[in-house]
Design a protein with these regions (language model features):
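Transmembrane alpha-helices of multi-pass small-molecule transport proteins
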Residues: 40-89, 116-120, 167-171, 187-203
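Glycine-/small-residue-enriched transmembrane alpha-helix faces in small-molecule transporters
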Residues: 1-48, 85, 89-93, 141, ...
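C-terminal transmembrane-helix exit sites in multi-pass transporters
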Residues: 61, 96, 113-134, 251-271
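Hydrophobic/small/kink-forming positions within alpha-helical transmembrane segments
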Residues: 29, 33, 51, 58, ...
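Helix-helix packing/entry segments at the starts of transmembrane helices
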Residues: 106-112, 174-193, 223-259
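C-terminal-most transmembrane helix of multi-pass membrane proteins
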Residues: 2-7, 50, 247-297
Length: 297
């Protein structure tokens, strides 16, 4: 292979990596739209989404590990179990929060996770650079505008969204130190935990044919396909680029419900969200340490 051919091949891989990660972000961004179309109660939403996610992720793990499913789950270790528990909290809080506030509010709060992760890292001895404190301060101002502005979002929705973001930030910190933890089995186990928690509150009689399709789209499409595309793309491009491209989810999510359902975020929400996104982009661009590729709730 000539140098020119190798260069072209690397450029092609880089482009494919960007496309895969962008497709992951698009898949994740559909969560708010699908959830808004559901008529079932929140317990049924949680259990149904988790059940389909488990099926999809088990199939993915079986294919990726060439049938060694049990081996893959054993390999995640104690840290993988902790990650699964935190992801279960984050994933469950995500769906619950969508029932209390706008898609834009939930996703803008979710965008805080990388900045919060930098702060949580201090508890495991990671130094916090000045740029991180700047990003955190700006992000807090953005959240303050969203919460305290004239849009008056639900306090319950904002609080649950913050729980989602903090728990996901903890996942980022752990996976940054334990890059050997496989995210697919951990994500699958997290959905098993969500299913076990939500099952007593679920009512199968609430699920019609339309809701069944929507729950399948949430579980298999939004979670499963998103993780598959991320896994394919993250191998081909730098982690910092992955982190930036996945921010498409935060932009597209509110856009889908705005176009399809006329759920228009208020001016304060959009302004505050833009400030939060700006802080996260600043943190990602200026940080010399690449973040691990981690799928969101």
């Amino acid at each position: 292979m000539t140098t020119a051919t190798a260069t072209v091949d690397l450029v092609g891989q880089h482009r494919r990596g960007r496309v895969y990660v962008a497709l992951a972000a698009v898949a994740w961004s559909t969560a708010g739209l699908f959830q808004r179309e559901l008529s079932a109660g929140v317990g049924t939403q949680l259990a149904g989404r988790a059940a389909f996610a488990v099926l999809g992720l088990l199939a993915f793990v079986a294919i990726a590990e060439r049938g060694g499913v049990l081996r893959a789950f054993r390999a995640i270790g104690r840290d993988g179990l902790i990650v699964a528990g935190l992801m279960a909290v984050s994933s469950g809080a995500f769906i619950v929060a969508l029932n209390y506030t706008t898609v834009a509010n939930v996703l803008f709060m979710q965008a805080l996770a990388p900045v919060l992760a930098a702060v949580l890292g201090t508890f495991v001895g990671e130094p916090v650079a000045r740029r991180t404190w700047v990003a955190m301060t700006v992000a807090v101002l953005g959240v303050g505008l969203m919460v305290g502005g004239p849009d008056h979002p639900s306090l319950a929705g904002v609080s649950i969204s913050l729980l989602m973001s903090v728990s996901f930030a903890a996942v980022i910190v752990i996976t940054r130190h334990r890059r050997d933890v496989s995210m697919a089995p951990a994500t699958c186990l997290s959905q098993v935990l969500v299913l076990l928690f939500a099952a007593p509150f679920a009512d199968p009689s609430e699920i019609g044919g339309r809701d069944l399709l929507l729950l399948a789209a949430l579980g298999v499409g939004q979670i499963g396909l998103g993780l598959i595309f991320l896994s394919l793309g993250a191998r081909l491009i730098p982690a910092a680029e992955v982190a930036l491209i996945t921010l498409l989810e935060i932009v597209l999510g509110p856009l889908w419900v705005w176009i399809a359902l006329s759920e228009r975020p208020g001016a304060a929400t959009l302004t505050g969200g833009a400030i939060v996104l700006g802080a996260v982009v600043f943190q990602a661009v200026s940080s010399p340490r690449p973040e691990p590729a981690t799928s969101p709730p």
